[in-house]
């Protein structure tokens, strides 16, 4: 997806200029997750035919780009994009308008938002539209609505998600798994506030280099910011008491709520939000401990992705190097970069290089994961930081009694838990592994006469902490089976008079697999094991066949 964005942005610029030539007033262009967008100031709606007529001329004559604005015939159009630049080498000729909508930035103004894509060849466009049609069938926003997982509400604010009980169940399972991973590496979990005085962000450098994402407000004469990252708070915990070389490494973890003011046109379901939770971690350690710590993090990261069924070919690490806007000396950056390279090489992983895509305080390893639709998602990150310990004057007492600076490592394996939920929903097409499913078993009594037995089966599962529910015989059995499949329930237990008299169940699983005359206790034992082991496949039904 990322590889398409330069040509999309160029296409958006071309279309904006064409719209100006047709008498329209575009005010901004930008990129979404799957397309470009153009905001046009207009008191009336704009039809698809009108937009298509504006795609006839693809000439960038008499156009200049100044201060991230398109300047053309007295018009200035803002370019809402800071990661993708406009290339003179690209020549988009084939356009597709995907959507036209209206929104009101204030009560007195109306904008028409045009969403589309552009490619250099007709074949690229056709391939993308075919892929997009397939992707829309597994759109996490539609799955989330169908399965009652989460919702967004304009009155609550754009990019601010509300997780419903079933959606929160998925998040809780992801957090519980990561807690186990953290425990295995020796982390101590902390909690820090959502809001801090901006003094902390000024010391860290976020106030200057991350200012456009910071949400800042004034109260009682002091300036506060809603935290976009957890690292400065963890630094203050480290500073709260003296540390010695024997204490290191110190590993803090937090499922921290962070908030970043993403541009409205870039918001996209759970994939791009303004408030989310990170599985964050920070390690304070000596330089001589750095390489082994990074190697352990790399190993654990790969272990986690294997648990979700991703193969080695689906996992691609990148070394991201120093960006143009950064803090710290060349010497510190070189030292940090070399530590990451050594750990990657010793781990035996093939890795790519992303020039100038490191954090402003240090280089990093980013892991990209390929989903079932062939898309690559940047998720895990490991960042080495010599700079924030210097800026916050962190210290530990070395064995020779001298005060020294620790090194800091920032890491997140899921990245954003909310975003990871979206990726999993699309990757598994709403059919999550049993351990992650909000409802793991649905019991279907064939008639009301066996309700008592069905309820006993239900309650026995709930006592064993299995998320089970019952669908009584209000509709036909085939209709209830279809409903359970459509709602992503991994296991369906059908009980009739025969099952009630014999203490058995008929088990149905995904893929229209059915196993009859299964002793309920045997099913329960196998299911508990499948869930405890966090299997991706339905090992219970495999063992029963």
Curated annotation (Swiss-Prot):
A Pfam entry, by short name: HGTP_anticodon
Top-level division of the source organism's lineage: Archaea
Annotated localization: Cytoplasm
GO molecular function terms attached to this record: ATP binding; metal ion binding; threonine-tRNA ligase activity; tRNA binding
Annotated positions binding Zn(2+): 231, 282, 410
Positions of region (Catalytic): 139-433
Role according to the record: Catalyzes the attachment of threonine to tRNA(Thr) in a two-step reaction: L-threonine is first activated by ATP to form Thr-AMP and then transferred to the acceptor end of tRNA(Thr). Also activates L-serine and transfers it to tRNA(Thr) but cannot deacylate incorrectly charged amino acid; unlike most archaea the editing function is found in a freestanding protein.
Protein name: Threonine--tRNA ligase catalytic subunit
Lineage: Archaea, Thermoproteota, Thermoprotei, Sulfolobales, Sulfolobaceae
Gene for this chain: thrS-cat
């Amino acid at each position: 997806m990322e590889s398409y964005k330069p040509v999309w942005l160029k296409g958006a610029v071309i279309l904006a200029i064409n719209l100006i030539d047709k008498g329209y007033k575009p005010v901004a262009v930008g990129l979404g997750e799957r397309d470009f967008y153009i905001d046009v100031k207009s008191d009336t709606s704009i039809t698809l035919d009108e937009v298509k007529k504006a795609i006839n001329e693809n000439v960038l004559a008499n156009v200049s780009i100044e201060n991230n604005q398109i300047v053309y015939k007295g018009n200035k159009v803002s370019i809402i994009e800071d990661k993708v630049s406009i290339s003179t080498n690209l020549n988009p000729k084939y356009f597709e308008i995907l959507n036209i909508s209206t929104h009101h930035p204030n009560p007195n103004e109306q904008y028409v938002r045009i969403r589309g894509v552009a490619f250099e060849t007709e074949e690229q466009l056709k391939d993308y539209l075919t892929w997009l049609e397939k992707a829309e069938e597994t759109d996490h926003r539609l799955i989330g609505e169908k399965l009652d997982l989460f919702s967004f509400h304009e009155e609550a604010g754009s990019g601010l998600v509300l997780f419903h009980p079933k959606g929160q169940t998925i998040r809780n399972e992801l957090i519980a798994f990561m807690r186990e991973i953290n425990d295995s590496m020796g982390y101590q979990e902390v909690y820090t506030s959502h809001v801090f005085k901006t003094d902390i962000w000024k010391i860290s450098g976020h106030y200057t280099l991350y200012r456009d994402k910071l949400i800042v407000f004034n109260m009682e004469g002091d300036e506060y910011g809603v935290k976009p990252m957890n690292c400065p708070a963890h630094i203050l915990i480290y500073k709260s008491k003296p540390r010695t070389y024997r204490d290191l490494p110190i590993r803090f973890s937090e499922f921290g709520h962070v908030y970043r003011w993403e541009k409205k046109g870039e918001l996209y379901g759970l994939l791009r939000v303004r408030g989310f939770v990170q599985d964050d971690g920070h390690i304070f350690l000596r330089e001589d401990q750095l390489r082994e710590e990074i190697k352990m993090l790399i190993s654990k990261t790969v272990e986690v992705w294997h648990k979700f069924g991703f193969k080695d070919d689906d996992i691609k690490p990148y070394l991201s190097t120093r960006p143009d806007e950064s803090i710290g000396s060349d010497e510190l950056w070189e030292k940090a970069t070399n530590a990451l390279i050594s750990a990657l090489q010793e781990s035996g992983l093939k890795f790519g290089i992303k020039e100038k895509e490191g954090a402003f305080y240090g280089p990093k390893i980013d892991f990209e994961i390929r989903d079932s639709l062939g898309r690559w998602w940047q998720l895990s990150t490991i960042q080495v930081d010599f700079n924030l310990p210097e800026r916050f004057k962190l210290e530990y007492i070395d064995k020779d009694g001298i005060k020294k600076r620790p090194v800091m490592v920032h890491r997140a394996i899921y990245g954003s838990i909310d975003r990871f939920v979206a990726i999993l929903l699309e990757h598994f097409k709403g059919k999550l592994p049993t351990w992650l499913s909000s409802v793991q078993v649905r019991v279907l009594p064939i008639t009301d006469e066996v309700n008592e037995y069905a309820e006993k089966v239900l309650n026995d599962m709930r006592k064993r902490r299995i998320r089970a529910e019952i669908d009584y015989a209000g509709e036909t059995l085939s209709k209830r089976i279809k409903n359970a499949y459509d709602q992503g329930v991994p296991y369906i237990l059908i009980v009739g008079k025969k099952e009630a008299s014999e203490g058995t169940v008929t088990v149905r699983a995904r893929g229209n697999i059915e196993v009859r005359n299964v002793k309920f206790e045997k099913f329960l034992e196998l299911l508990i094991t499948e869930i405890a082991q966090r299997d991706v496949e339905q090992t219970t039904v495999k063992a029963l066949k």
